[in-house]
């Protein structure tokens, strides 16, 4: 028996063990993923966001978040199609660095985060016991998911 013939079963076993370990890690990571369906904002935060939205965003995006001539809708299929699978930190950054279009960057980060909570409520995501954090790092861990879990 050649050396490669003797080592073949060990190489095969090592490959199986590696694949099993990677599968377990992937399964744990998927199970630990937080999404917008995990009640990531509070009702009072969404209410603050609604007030801020009415004062700062509605003139371009519409009172019902349906969009305007040059501003996209912030609810429904187009919005979810653009943001599905992305972290809320990306949405926060987009708003903070591009809105309002005539005076970019004037919105305080708490206001932006509260408006995101309002947008989540308007898109049918449930409220919870803890506020959506304004810090970027925790928002990187919350993924926008278009479809309600278990509805497929």
Language-model region placement:
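Short linear capping/connector segments at secondary-structure termini
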Residues: 34-35, 70-79, 133-137
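The canonical Cys-X-X-Cys-His
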Residues: 49, 53-64, 115, 119
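Flexible coil segments in periplasmic/lumen-exposed cytochrome c-class electron-transfer proteins
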Residues: 34, 104-152
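Electrostatic cytochrome c docking/interface patches
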Residues: 27-52
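Generic structural signal for alpha-helix termini and adjacent loop/cap motifs
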Residues: 63, 97-98, 121-125
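Bacterial N-terminal signal peptides
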Residues: 10-21
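Gly/Gly-Pro-rich "capping" loops immediately C-terminal to redox-active cysteine motifs
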Residues: 40-46, 65-100
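N-terminal secretory signal peptides that target proteins for export/translocation
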Residues: 1-6
């Amino acid at each position: 028996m050649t050396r490669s013939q003797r080592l073949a079963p060990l190489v095969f076993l090592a490959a199986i063990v590696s694949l099993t370990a990677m599968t377990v890690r992937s399964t744990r990571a998927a199970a630990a993923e937080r999404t917008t369906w995990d009640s990531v904002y509070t009702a009072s935060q969404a209410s603050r966001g609604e007030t801020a939205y009415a004062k700062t965003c509605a003139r371009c995006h519409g009172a019902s978040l349906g969009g305007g001539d040059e501003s996209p809708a912030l609810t429904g299929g187009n919005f979810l199609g653009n943001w599905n699978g992305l972290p809320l930190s990306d949405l926060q950054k987009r708003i903070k660095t591009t809105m309002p279009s005539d005076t970019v960057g004037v919105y305080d980060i708490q206001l932006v985060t509260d408006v995101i909570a309002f947008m989540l409520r308007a898109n049918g995501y449930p409220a919870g016991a803890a506020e959506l954090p304004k810090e970027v790092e925790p928002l990187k861990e919350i993924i926008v998911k278009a479809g309600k879990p278990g509805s497929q």
